[in-house]
Amino acid sequence: GEHLREAFLRSGPDMVAELDAKTAVKFAAALAHPDYVKNQPGEAFGGRALAPVAFDAKVLGDDFDRVLPPRPEFMGLGGMMVNRNELSALLRPVSSVGNAKTTLKVVLPYFKDRLKYKRGTRLVMGNALVGRLLYSLKQYQTEIWYEAPLQELLLEEGRVIGAIVDTVNGRQRIIARKGVVLATGGVAWNPALRQQYFPVGTRDYSLAPQLSTGDGLSNGLKVGAKLDNEDHPVLWFPCSTFKKPNGQMAVWPHIILDRAKPGLIAVNASGKRFVNETDSYHDFCVGQLAAQHNNASTPAYLICDDAFIHKYGLGLIMPGAQKLKHYLKHGYVVQAATVRELANKIGVDAHELEQSVVRNNAYAITGEDLEFGRGTGKMNRFNGDAAIGPNPCIGPILTAPFYA
């Protein structure tokens, strides 16, 4: 509610200042990172989002292996982390002198790291935050119990006074001097809780680590905690899945590389668009779930043409990819010579999909999306392609073959 937002705004700066002064946790403001909620009073182009400063994990010694790596799909060359600005350069390393310099600056140290480490030691984003927090705890000589899952919260006269955890040395009873903080992750891999709390169509996959089984939530509810009734109490990402040859399931979030770029639309089982594809990943899914009440929108399909997929990529298919046979063979993407044929292959209404493409192509000329306002707001346009006009988020779907 409002009081929680006020508490966050009031206390957030104090938290950042204290971490900066007393720990190795350092943040930098993202100068170009528009607000996700658009057309609101005070909307800003950047400066609000804070990102952890890149961290050299070599200082962790053997504890570096305790930092859970990102999903394999998120790392380049088998173990290299990059931030968003670097990613743009690495995707087109020879397009400019600046891109070439950035690529060499990132790639050469990585190859040196791999002579000794299982992956690159330069951590960015969430991994950098975890690494900096762990290093700070080590500097303060804080005792950390690994492999010690929570089993039960201890209650005395209606107040939580401690916890029981399983450790490598057996079950331990811990009495807290001040309080117990539940920081055990969400419920992403708890089938019963997902079935209870998540909408239909969102219960199968997650980007969260598989250790996120809702232990904190379950134990909190047992001692009288209450779960609020917010409409969307989780973070949604539109994802595609691909079963790898080794049997593992790759889950790819469609965040910035494809969904917001000109020349792509998202449609439901009726072949109709249902949302502004360029809105934030969370808002995209909120719109998708809302549309589910009228038309089957989970799963949905991303539709593009040959020119788009080679310029921007599509999900796991990176920009510039020349060979799509592997992805076609395993059904990650579907290819067709015409939009109607594509509709028939994926099982959506062919006439409606054709009309959705016709309308999109008209919007590409006028620069105005009359259905969902695609390309309005700072964030929409920032994630588009500034070289395309009149709207950086809308482009024609014309060049066969077509893909879903």
Residue ranges and their predicted role:
Residues 1-27, 135-139, 218, 222-225:
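Conserved FAD-binding subdomain of flavin-dependent enzymes
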Residues 2, 23-35, 120, 226-229, ...:
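A short alpha-helix-loop-beta-strand transition element characteristic
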Residues 27-65, 355, 361-373:
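Terminal amphipathic helices with adjacent charged low-complexity linkers/tails
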Residues 38-46, 53-102, 217-219, 223-348, ...:
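An anion/pyrophosphate-binding glycine-rich loop and adjacent beta-alpha core
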Residues 55-72, 106-178, 214-223:
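Helical element adjacent to the flavin cofactor pocket in flavoenzyme catalytic cores
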Residues 120-127, 135, 139, 167-246:
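Glycine-rich loop(s) and the adjacent beta-strand/alpha-helix scaffold that form part
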Residues 152, 156-159, 352-404:
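A glycine-rich dinucleotide-binding beta-alpha-beta segment and adjacent secondary-structure elements
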Residues 207-209, 253-258, 279-280, 393-404:
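Short Gly/Pro-enriched turn/cap motifs at secondary-structure boundaries
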